[in-house]
């Protein structure tokens, strides 16, 4: 593994779940990391596969934890999904299973809801997920709708442990229809390029930070960025042995970054 000169990096793309917080609890060192980003005038963007929350809700969540991060510093897989659909098929219609973050993102890009003959079936994390909605989605795909997933995460951390995430929820539709979904969140390079463009950075000037090898690290690596795997979420050091690629740096948590930057 290499080292990273964090002081020399211009932009930071950072995951949230398992990196900044776990459920409704802020992780050790997260506040110090965010304050360091702000105090040193780094460009930063929280790039999350969480499709359920809007940027405003994410801002409010961190505010309740004592952190002030403006809404423009969040980019979610729901926003990436809405951008993809608006670019591919302006004015299209969808049957969507998801929370406010996904539904609002779709509406904001002029995408309409349609449960009769939609162009796409779009699935994100959804508390309303049920056998009825699953059956509806399956039959719409069989009738010709294209299947879209907000992200390819199979699970995510919660206060209770682990919860199934988007890929686990969309899998029954894939199996029942024989159709493969297209996933818009990390590690899709479209989401990474959008993040870099929002930061105003080239890949060599940026760092990708996350707790997952299969989304965060690979997306950063394939985009040409330095990568940091933190062990505060779903990964352990043993996780590294499961993959053919490696992050640039492995840290216990993001709180290590300002400490390493101070050491030079």
Mark where each language-model region is:
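Asp-based, Mg2+/Mn2+-dependent phosphohydrolase catalytic module
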Residues: 2-16, 21-42, 55-75, 82-264
């Amino acid at each position: 593994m290499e080292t990273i000169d964090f002081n020399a990096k211009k932009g930071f793309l950072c995951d949230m779940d398992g990196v900044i917080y776990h459920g409704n609890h802020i992780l050790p060192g997260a506040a110090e990391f965010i304050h360091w980003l702000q105090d040193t005038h780094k460009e930063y963007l929280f790039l999350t596969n969480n499709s359920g929350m809007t940027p405003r809700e994410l801002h409010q969540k961190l505010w309740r934890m004592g952190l002030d991060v403006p809404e423009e510093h969040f980019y979610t897989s729901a926003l990436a999904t809405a951008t993809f659909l608006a670019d591919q098929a302006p004015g299209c219609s969808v049957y969507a299973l998801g929370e406010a973050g996904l539904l609002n993102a779709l509406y904001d890009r002029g995408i309409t809801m349609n449960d009769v003959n939609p162009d796409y079936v779009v699935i994100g994390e959804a508390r309303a997920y049920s056998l009825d909605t699953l059956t509806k989605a399956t039959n719409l795909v069989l009738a010709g709708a294209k299947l879209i997933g907000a992200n390819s995460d199979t699970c995510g951390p919660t206060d209770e442990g682990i919860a199934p995430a988007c890929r686990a929820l969309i899998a029954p539709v894939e199996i029942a229809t024989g159709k493969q979904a297209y996933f818009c969140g990390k590690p899709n390079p479209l989401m990474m390029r959008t993040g870099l463009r929002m930061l105003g950075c080239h890949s060599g000037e940026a760092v990708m930070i996350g707790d997952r090898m299969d989304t965060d690290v690979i997306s950063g690596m394939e985009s040409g960025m330095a990568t940091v795997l933190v062990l505060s979420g779903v990964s352990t050091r043993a996780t590294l042995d499961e993959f053919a690629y490696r992050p640039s740096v492995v840290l216990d948590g993001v709180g290590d970054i300002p400490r390493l930057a101070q050491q030079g």
